[in-house]
Amino acid sequence: MLSVTGVETALACSENEPTTSSEISVSPIDDSDPIQFNKRSLSDEDRLKLLKTKWIPSSNSYIFPKNDHNRRYSKSWENEYSWLRYSPSQDGTYCSLCSAFQDHSSENPRYNEFVTVPYKEWKNALGEKRGRLALHSNIERHLKALQKTVYYCLFQIRTSHP
């Protein structure tokens, strides 16, 4: 089984290149918003950008919007789940690995969650029983995407440094 920590240590392409945005209402879509890669075929450049870039608010005092249940996204979740990408235009999150290496979509919205459908149920993001972030980290689809990311990044490193 692949270790995320090992992948991040071994691969330069797993490091994040922070970008900033000054506001949440993004029009046109912010350059670091993962929604721009949604439901389309990705070039190598797009795939690398999706894997490496995270949206970063322009201010440390930025307050993420609350949902209908008075809950909000927490930037600290990205410390444990390095694959997590916040979309300011959707106020939801995506998995950079699964989005970069989409296998196929499904009629089941839970299957597409974090990939083509943003995850927004902040109440269930963490927790032993219903923690969707931890559950997503361990599903077969995510583990396959993690493996593809490792091979892809190794290939990128080998071809860029012969």
Model segments located where?
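N-terminal leader/early-domain signal
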Residues: 1-162
